[in-house]
Design a protein with these regions (language model features):
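C-terminal extracytoplasmic interaction modules
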Residues: 7
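Lipid interaction determinants
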Residues: 1-2, 13-145
Length: 145
């Protein structure tokens, strides 16, 4: 799973408003009840679905937050990078929207549907960014300018 969007916090409930999503719509709102177990660990309990997620803060991930957004009318040109400390995420949505129903299996269409990037990486002291994990495996170990 992976998405990029906005988080709305009301009391102990978090509502995630997905602007771009790696998966097709599920029919459920993304709402979780959060419990701060420690200053380094958050437990998230599903409200509309039954799940538990455990979020653990990574070392070196508390300073120097930044955001870089490239917006445009062409979906393929949209991109977002966010970072904090020595870590960053890079998100680029697929150009076509995922269909609600199965369509004929056209190879080019299938390739376009999976062309959605969410990459997680690490930034070194000199500013070099290297992708560690990605929805596009060939991006892993790539150095970003």
């Amino acid at each position: 799973q992976g998405f990029c969007g906005l988080t709305e916090v009301i009391g102990d409930l978090c509502h995630w408003h997905r602007k771009v999503d790696f998966q097709p719509p599920s029919g459920f709102n993304d709402v979780g009840r959060v419990v701060f177990e420690t200053s380094e660990r958050v437990l998230e309990y599903g409200v509309e679905q039954d799940y538990l997620e455990i979020w653990q803060r990574l070392p070196d991930s508390v300073e120097d937050p930044w955001v870089n957004v490239s917006a445009g009318t062409d979906t393929a040109a949209r991109m977002m990078q966010i970072g904090v400390g020595k870590y960053f995420m890079h998100v680029r949505p697929r150009a076509p929207s995922l269909p609600v129903a199965d369509l004929e299996h056209d190879l080019d269409a299938l390739r376009a549907w999976v062309d959605f990037e969410i990459s997680f990486g690490e930034q070194t002291a000199d500013g070099t960014r290297r992708i560690l994990r990605s929805t596009l495996p060939w991006q892993e170990s790539l150095i970003l300018a």
